[in-house]
């Protein structure tokens, strides 16, 4: 954008005359300038001053100069100006939309301090900033002002976000506060060092120009984005700022300079443009940017105002519209014909790439990268919506205030002036006649706006969508296809016409449809009215009031209606008559009435009604004007309207309201209609009582609200309101209500009030008094006391009887146990159901009678279907059947009849029911009933009557005999035939099996179609024959079309073609040939057609079908050369030669060579003539023609003569002719082929010297082939014999190549194999050559080839041996499997021996894995052997070799390696390996200190064995289970001991594990286990110290027994109540070292004299050792953590258990002291149990 000085608007004055504010109207048509003399100058859109008015002070007594104008802004609708003044007031002036309107104050807001700044974001709300720091909001309608928030600093600026979602206020202390409209919250977002007087709010945040010569950019959150500092430049302080309408550009003004900043979407930042300097401007204090973005107005301190042009570039469209780009996203379009301007702006800030003018040059379409902008140049409104244009969209501009975009079956509605789409629908019917949309203009009040779309969902269904809420308002289904629809202007009615030209009017709100006109050729709403004009024939129909569609005005016209035109004075229908266009004028007065109401011109509407008082609908029209006038606050007009219809009450009421309004206007200003009492009274008049109540309550006028209801006798609403508001006189109000009810005789209403007060007894009396016994009964039932009061209930019952509510009286008497009266009144009230229900237990004998009476009652009232069941209950089946029949309940009637015992009665009913089913068409059921009733003839007649002859025949045959039936039906058929009832006769003929009679009948009367139909159905084999017969008949009669049809249907299209050919109807013949006969047939007929007409006509015909060339060829092929010459001469002269050649060819075939040669020459093909004479050996004529016409063929003539000489053996003459023909190469080739080598060399040397060397070489090769050169000769000879097919000589020659003739082994092998191939192919029947070849192959060591030959010779065994010698094992095995299966093992054995001897293990594995593994083991390649065994996926094989290797490693005492092997390959459950596992366990546990890693490895191996044994259910499972438990407990204890005793839980857990290990002393080192358990118990102390003594004492006994070698010395009696083994094998040596042993021995001895030790096991509540699993009840499961028995607090972990407390302790220990070994234990337990460990709660 560039800034350019444009012009001076107001000249500067000599002294100070500051322009305080410049404001531009949102519609771009005006600009207001606040001058120093307290006046406001108004400029038009061209910057010319058109008006000026002076501002007023808050009070005239202060004088006209008692204030200054501080701020000013336009309203959103541009019709008002708000002016803030220093004398604490805000005035709103109405300036209107035209220049001649008077400027009046419409709102006055008195403020507590001076108004410093303004912003007007919404029509009804204005933001006010004040000197005292308050930010207030003014409500325009109520003329009230309230504070939004308050600060202590003056408000220096207020700016609203472009999208009106929030605003910011700037204050004297530099703070900026953001207020959000939706959340109604404010927050301080930043604070500047200087007051932010110059502030704008853009789409990209805040821009502030400060007095310290800086321009700052902030985000909405107060974060600094950019800073432009001009302190280092010759710049003065910034004095004003303005933002363009797109909020993409900002201009900042200083002393004499304007600086431009533009937002860069690409950079996301502000870019500074070139500044504009204005000399002598002297401080620009005010800026205003026109809404079209083209001009900036700048005001100075000296009172001068000038304009600045803002433009990027300019251009022209259609030589009429000037485009001015004020920004990439803002274009001004100026129509140079009338100087109107239109803004095209992208509110998204996108660059406008393309502009198009559409819709009769009224509408502008702007395209951006991702949106589309549509602008109306007349209304100056534009809209932008997101759109990805593919260039295929269509635009419909036929509708007011909106545009339709059609794209890919979607209809998008765009309202001018509103961004985004108004709505969209999907339909394939997108013609503008099938779409109608009505969108109200911006001048319509919000609550009256209409936005509706009518469209076709399918050709017969109309949908009407409310575009405001997106809901479907109406869905209209029509019987036929609709071809035109249109909504009226208010979208309250819809007109549509269907394709049968019927016009229908639909009232959308009531869905009422009225057919207005049939055979309609034109229909239209009169513009800007609800009048309908339609034409049908020469009749023009007008509906002036569509609400009364029956009131139609008709006039005769003499043409077709073209259009309906309307202006201010008249409305005319333009009719195109035969001679000219004629205008028929409509009653414009009636139309104007509706238009006046639409425009709210009530005075004009009243004037119309006053001049038309005699109309039939005048009353409704006065009412309509009155209601609309009231709605728009025009009370005088409303009063006049009500007076016209003599509604005195409303006239008086309006008079009172007007008096109140006049009084209010004095106090609050305006016309007083905004006064709350006026608004409330108007709401009361409109019966909007809740609205009036709300208005009163908003003003805290409770008395008036309640008084309104009481005056209207709406006591309930008054009481409800009083109760909600806690009205102090509520009780008095209620008393007044009761008194009023009593005075007016409203006892029932009083009773309701009594009920609500809880006085039920009084309420009941009042209900009875008001003759409302049901309400009394309801009140009594709701009172637990009164519902049991017999007197009250009898009073109510009597009242019910008086009111003839007998059924309710019966209920009361039933409650009183007076069953007789209850039943009596139930019957009187026809409540038979209740009577029967009561009688079932009170009077059972009356139930049947009551059922009968109930049935009779239902029958009496016509409820026959209900009566049926009651007659059945009363066992009156006849009445039941009759009721069912009268109710037309035929199935029910039939079921009842079947239960009647009297056959005679039943038969009568069957007939009646059968008649029903017969009439209904249920013939099968009717037949059954007729037969059941014995009415056979009725059944037969039924079928005959309904032309069901087959069924009639069947029944007749069944009941009257076949012969009689056939005779009767044949006669009937013939009779029908004679009377022309052929269809019925046909059915009868077919029914009796005589279809030929029907065929003959139809053939006789000439109904060929029926003949064909019956022949096809019953004699299909004669169908083609019949059709051909008919075709011949038609042909004879001259009906060739019918004949053609039958020929074609018979598949004989050739006959049809011949028929037309014979009749010379060539076009028809050609048509059939083309469609039925294929391409060849088509051509034949066409050529025959052409031949028949000849000449130019034939050429034209063939050219028409593009067949001229093919026609010439066809003529030639058929010998019609005269026709061919004619066609070529006339239409294709270039084909004349071809015709001559074709004729010459035919003449040659006929032997007429001389004539043929002439035509060859005329056809420019003399060479063909020469060739013809050569073929005929006529050398003279051939030489003559060649010399005359084609000398190039003379060599061919001579060559032919030479060939003849060669054939005769005259070589010399042949040589002469060939040399004359200059073809020495031919005679050379002849001499070579005949091996005449000297002659060949002579010719080559004399005439072809370049070939002499080659001939010499060939001469030498010939000698070689003849055996002159040894082995090479043999090879050459063999090759030559092979080429000649002399296989024996070829083989003999090849076999001569052997060690006797050469030392070249490769040549010998190749020659021998070649000889064998020849023998196999050609000499397999010659044993001599087979033997010779085999001998040679054996000598040459060609075993594979020998095997092939032997196999062909039938020597399978020798062939297999040969393959083995060739080491072709696979082939040998394959051959053996096919021919000698018994040799397969022998071959495999030889193969294995070969592989083994050659050491080829890889191949041996594939053949014999066991042998291969054994070889690896022999080579000590155990890892490779085990990997190979593992790869076989056969576990026993792997286990075998693992066991072998483990045994070897054990023998080597390499136990670590044994563990590694078992871990890698798995431990098997083979008992042979058990000793190894036992050894591993013993050796690992025999070490002085337990190593967790080693124990864990042994434990893991045992787990593998454990799992395998468990799967096999092995007898060794228990043995390994005990070993695994022992290893597990030792491993877990070892892992825990690493933590130490610092954790209290660890010591107890280790103790329990040690005690649990005692049960495994028979498989562990006994002395060690007892020692460790005793030491743990001793160290733990407390109750376990005695146990420690007992166990350590036993340990000493074991040591003594070990030393003595006598296990009987050990006493196991202390362990009787435990599972500690008593038979334990003694170790060979003591485990503990002597020092510790002596120490422990001393402690035991010292403790033995202490009586404190009980010297016994620790027992639990079971009475056994606490670590023992076994007790009297059985064996408990061990705990996974301690090994203790789990008796209670069981936690199930997979397949195992744990005691909850010990499990939790263990897991807590792991969590608080994570070690690698503890985690390993946890993982092992989870794997063993099959479930992870988790803390149990």
From Swiss-Prot:
Coiled-coil regions listed: none
**Is ATP-binding found in the keyword set?**
no
Please give a single GO biological process term from the UniProt record. cilium assembly
Which keywords appear in this protein's UniProt record, sorted alphabetically?
A: Cell projection, Cilium, Developmental protein, Repeat, TPR repeat, WD repeat
UniProt KW DNA repair keyword = no
Give the superkingdom in one word. Answer: Eukaryota
Name the PANTHER family for this protein: IFT140/172-RELATED, INTRAFLAGELLAR TRANSPORT PROTEIN 172 HOMOLOG
Described by its record, this protein's role is as follows: Component of the intraflagellar transport (IFT) complex B required for transport of proteins in the motile cilium. May be required for ciliary entrance and transport of specific ciliary cargo proteins such as che-3 which are related to motility. Required for the maintenance and formation of chemosensory cilia that detect chemosensory cues.
The entry's protein name is Intraflagellar transport protein osm-1
Q: Which organism is it from?
A: Caenorhabditis elegans
């Amino acid at each position: 954008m560039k800034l350019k000085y444009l012009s001076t608007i107001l000249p500067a004055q000599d002294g100070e005359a500051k322009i305080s504010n410049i404001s531009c109207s949102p519609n771009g048509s005006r600009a207001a300038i606040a001058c120093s003399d307290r006046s406001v100058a108004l400029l038009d859109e061209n910057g010319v001053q058109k008006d000026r008015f002076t501002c007023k002070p808050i009070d005239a007594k202060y004088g006209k100069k008692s204030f200054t104008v501080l701020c000013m802004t336009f309203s959103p609708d541009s019709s008002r100006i708000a002016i803030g003044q220093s004398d604490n007031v805000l005035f709103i002036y109405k300036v209107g939309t035209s220049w001649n309107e008077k400027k009046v104050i419409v709102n006055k807001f008195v403020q507590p301090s001076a108004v410093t700044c303004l912003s007007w974001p919404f029509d009804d709300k204005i933001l006010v900033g004040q000197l005292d720091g308050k930010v207030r909001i003014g409500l325009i309608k109520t003329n009230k002002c309230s504070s939004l928030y308050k600060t202590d600093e003056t408000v220096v600026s207020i700016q609203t976000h472009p999208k009106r979602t929030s605003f910011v206020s700037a204050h004297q202390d530099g703070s900026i506060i953001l207020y959000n409209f939706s959340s109604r919250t404010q927050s301080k977002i930043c604070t500047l060092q200087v007051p932010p007087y110059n502030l704008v709010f853009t789409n990209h945040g805040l821009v502030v120009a400060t007095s310290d010569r800086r321009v700052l950019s902030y985000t909405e959150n107060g974060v600094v984005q950019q800073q432009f500092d001009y302190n280092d430049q010759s710049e003065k302080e910034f004095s004003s700022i303005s933002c363009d309408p797109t909020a993409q550009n900002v201009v900042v003004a200083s002393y004499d300079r304007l600086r431009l900043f533009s937002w860069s979407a690409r950079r996301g930042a502000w870019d500074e443009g070139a500044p504009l300097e204005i000399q002598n401007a002297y401080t620009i204090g005010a800026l205003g940017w026109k809404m079209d973005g083209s001009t900036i107005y700048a005001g100075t301190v000296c009172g001068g105002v000038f304009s600045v042009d803002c433009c990027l570039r300019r251009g022209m469209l259609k030589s009429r519209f000037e485009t001015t780009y004020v920004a990439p996203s803002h274009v001004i379009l100026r129509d140079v014909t009338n100087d109107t301007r239109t803004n095209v702006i992208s509110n998204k800030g996108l660059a406008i790439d393309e502009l198009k003018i559409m819709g009769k040059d009224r509408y502008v379409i702007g395209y951006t990268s991702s949106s589309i902008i549509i602008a109306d140049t007349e209304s100056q409104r534009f809209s932008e919506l997101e759109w990805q244009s593919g260039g295929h969209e269509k635009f419909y501009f036929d509708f007011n205030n909106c545009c339709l975009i059609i794209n890919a079956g979607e209809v998008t509605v765009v309202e001018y002036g509103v961004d985004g789409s108004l709505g969209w629908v999907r339909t394939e019917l997108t013609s503008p006649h099938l779409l109608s949309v009505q969108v109200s203009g911006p001048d319509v009040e919000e609550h009256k706006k209409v936005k509706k779309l009518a469209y076709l969902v399918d050709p017969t269904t109309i949908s009407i969508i409310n575009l405001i809420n997106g809901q479907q308002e109406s869905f209209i289904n029509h019987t036929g296809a609709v071809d035109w629809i249109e909504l009226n202007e208010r979208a309250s009615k819809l007109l549509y016409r269907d394709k049968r030209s019927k016009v229908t009017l639909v009232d959308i709100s009531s869905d009422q449809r009225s057919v207005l006109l049939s055979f309609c050729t034109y229909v239209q709403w009169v513009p800007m009215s609800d009048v309908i004009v339609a034409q049908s024939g020469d009749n023009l129909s007008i509906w002036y009031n569509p609400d009364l569609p029956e009131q139609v005005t008709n006039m005769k016209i003499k043409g077709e209606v073209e259009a309906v035109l309307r202006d201010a004075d008249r409305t005319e229908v333009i009719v195109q008559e035969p001679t000219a266009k004629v205008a028929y004028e409509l009653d414009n007065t009636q139309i104007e009435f509706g238009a006046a109401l639409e425009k709210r011109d009530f005075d004009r509407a009243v004037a119309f009604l006053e001049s038309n008082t005699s109309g039939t609908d005048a009353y409704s029209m006065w009412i309509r004007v009155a209601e609309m006038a009231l709605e728009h606050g025009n009370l005088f007009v409303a009063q006049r309207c009500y007076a016209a219809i003599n509604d005195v009450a409303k006239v008086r009421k309006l008079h009172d309201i007007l008096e109140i309004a006049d009084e209010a206007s004095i106090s609050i200003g305006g016309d007083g209609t905004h006064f709350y009492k006026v608004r409330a009274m108007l709401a009361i008049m409109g019966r909007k009582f809740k609205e009036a109540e709300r208005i009163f309550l908003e003003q805290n006028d409770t008395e008036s609200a309640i008084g309104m209801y009481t005056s209207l006798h709406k006591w309930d609403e008054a009481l409800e309101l009083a109760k909600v508001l806690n009205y102090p006189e509520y009780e008095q109000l209620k008393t007044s209500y009761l008194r009023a009810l009593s005075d007016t005789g409203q006892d029932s209403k009083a009773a309701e009030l009594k009920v609500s007060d809880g006085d039920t007894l009084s309420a009941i009396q009042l209900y009875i008094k008001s003759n409302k016994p049901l309400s009394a009964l309801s009140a009594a039932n709701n009172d637990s006391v009164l519902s049991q009061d017999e007197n009250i209930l009898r009073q109510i019952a009597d009242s019910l009887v008086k009111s003839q509510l007998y059924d309710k009286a019966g209920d009361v008497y039933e409650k009183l146990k007076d069953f007789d009266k209850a039943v009596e009144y139930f019957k009187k009230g026809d409540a038979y159901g209740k009577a029967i229900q009561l009688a079932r237990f009170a009077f059972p004998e009356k139930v049947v009678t009551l059922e009968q009476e109930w049935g009779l009652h239902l029958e009496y009232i016509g409820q026959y279907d209900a009566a049926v069941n009651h007659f059945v209950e009363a066992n009156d089946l006849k009445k039941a059947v009759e009721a069912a029949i009268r109710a037309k309940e035929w199935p029910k009637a039939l079921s009842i009849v079947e239960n009647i015992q009297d056959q005679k009665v039943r038969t009568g009913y069957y007939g009646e029911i059968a008649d029903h089913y017969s009439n209904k068409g249920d013939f099968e059921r009717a037949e059954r009933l007729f037969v059941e009733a014995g009415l056979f003839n009725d059944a037969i007649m039924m079928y005959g009557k309904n032309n069901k002859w087959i069924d009639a025949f069947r029944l007749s045959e069944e009941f009257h005999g076949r012969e009689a039936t056939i005779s009767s039906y044949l006669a009937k058929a013939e009779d029908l035939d004679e009377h022309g009832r052929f269809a019925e006769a046909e059915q009868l003929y077919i029914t009796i099996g005589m279809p030929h009679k029907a065929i003959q009948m139809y053939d006789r009367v000439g109904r060929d179609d029926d003949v064909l139909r019956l022949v096809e159905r019953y004699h299909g084999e004669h169908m083609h024959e019949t059709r051909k017969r008919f075709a011949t008949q038609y042909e004879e009669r001259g009906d060739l079309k019918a004949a053609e049809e039958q020929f074609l249907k018979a598949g004989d299209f050739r006959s049809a073609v011949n028929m037309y050919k014979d009749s010379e109807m060539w076009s028809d013949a050609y048509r059939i040939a083309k469609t039925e006969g294929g391409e060849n047939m088509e051509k034949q007929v066409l050529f025959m057609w052409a031949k028949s007409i000849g000449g130019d006509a034939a050429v034209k015909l063939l050219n028409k079908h593009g067949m001229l060339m093919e026609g010439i060829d066809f003529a030639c092929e058929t010998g019609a050369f005269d026709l061919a010459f004619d066609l070529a001469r006339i239409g294709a002269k270039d084909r004349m030669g071809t015709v001559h050649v074709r004729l010459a060819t035919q003449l040659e075939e006929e032997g007429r060579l001389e004539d043929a040669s002439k035509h060859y020459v005329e056809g420019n093909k003399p060479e063909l003539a020469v060739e013809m004479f050569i073929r005929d050996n006529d050398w003279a004529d051939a030489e003559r023609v060649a010399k005359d016409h084609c000398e190039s063929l003379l060599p061919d003539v001579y060559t032919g003569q030479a060939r003849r000489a060669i054939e005769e053996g005259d070589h010399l003459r042949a040589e002469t002719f060939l040399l004359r023909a200059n073809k020495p190469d031919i005679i050379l080739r002849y001499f070579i082929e005949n091996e005449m080598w000297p002659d060949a060399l002579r010719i080559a040397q004399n005439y072809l010297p370049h070939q002499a060397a080659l001939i010499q070489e060939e001469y030498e090769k010939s000698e070689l082939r003849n055996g002159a050169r040894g082995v090479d000769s043999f090879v050459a000879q063999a090759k030559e014999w092979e080429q000649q097919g002399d296989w024996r000589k070829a083989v003999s020659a090849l076999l001569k190549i052997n060690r006797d003739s050469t030392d070249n082994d490769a040549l010998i092998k190749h020659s021998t194999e070649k000889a064998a191939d020849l023998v196999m192919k050609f000499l397999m029947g010659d044993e001599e050559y087979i033997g010779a070849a085999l001998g040679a192959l054996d000598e040459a060591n060609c075993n594979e080839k020998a095997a092939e030959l032997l196999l062909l010779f039938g020597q399978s065994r020798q062939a297999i041996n040969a393959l083995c010698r060739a080491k072709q094992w696979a082939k040998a095995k394959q051959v053996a499997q096919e021919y000698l299966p018994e040799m397969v093992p022998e071959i495999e054995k030889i193969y294995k021996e070969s592989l083994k001897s050659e050491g080829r293990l890889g191949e041996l594995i594939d053949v014999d894995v066991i042998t291969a593994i054994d070889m690896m083991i022999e080579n000590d390649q155990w890892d490779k052997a085990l990997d190979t065994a593992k790869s076989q996926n056969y576990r026993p094989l792997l286990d075998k070799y693992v066991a072998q290797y483990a045994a070897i490693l054990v023998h080597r005492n390499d136990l670590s390696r044994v563990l590694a092997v078992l871990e890698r390959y798995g431990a098997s459950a083979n008992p042979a390996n058990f000793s190894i596992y036992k050894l591993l366990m013993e050796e690992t546990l025999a070490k002085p200190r337990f190593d967790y890693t080693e124990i864990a490895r042994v434990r893991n191996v045992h787990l593998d064995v454990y799992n395998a044994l468990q799967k096999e259910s092995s007898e060794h499972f228990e043995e390994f289970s005990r070993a695994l438990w022992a290893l597990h407990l030792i491993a877990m204890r070892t892992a825990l001991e690493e933590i130490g005793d610092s954790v209290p839980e660890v010591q107890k857990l280790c103790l329990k594990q040690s005690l649990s290990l005692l049960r495994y002393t028979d498989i562990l080192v006994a002395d060690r286990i007892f020692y460790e358990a005793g030491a743990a118990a001793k160290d733990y102390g407390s109750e376990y110290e005695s146990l420690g003594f007992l166990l350590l004492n036993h340990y000493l006994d074991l040591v003594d027994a070990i030393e003595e070698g006598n296990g009987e010395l050990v006493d196991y009696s202390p362990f009787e109540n435990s599972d500690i083994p008593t038979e334990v094998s003694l170790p060979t040596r003591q485990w503990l070292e002597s020092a510790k042993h002596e120490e422990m021995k001393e402690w035991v001895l010292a403790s033995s004299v202490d009586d404190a030790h009980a010297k016994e096991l620790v027992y639990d509540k079971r009475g056994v050792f606490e670590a023992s699993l076994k007790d009297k009840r059985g064996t408990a499961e061990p705990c996974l953590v301690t090994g203790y028995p789990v008796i209670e607090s069981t936690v199930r972990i997979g397949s195992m258990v744990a005691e909850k407390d010990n499990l939790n302790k263990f897991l807590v220990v792991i969590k608080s002291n994570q070690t690698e070994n503890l985690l390993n234990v946890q993982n092992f337990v989870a794997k063993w149990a099959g479930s992870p460990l988790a803390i149990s709660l």
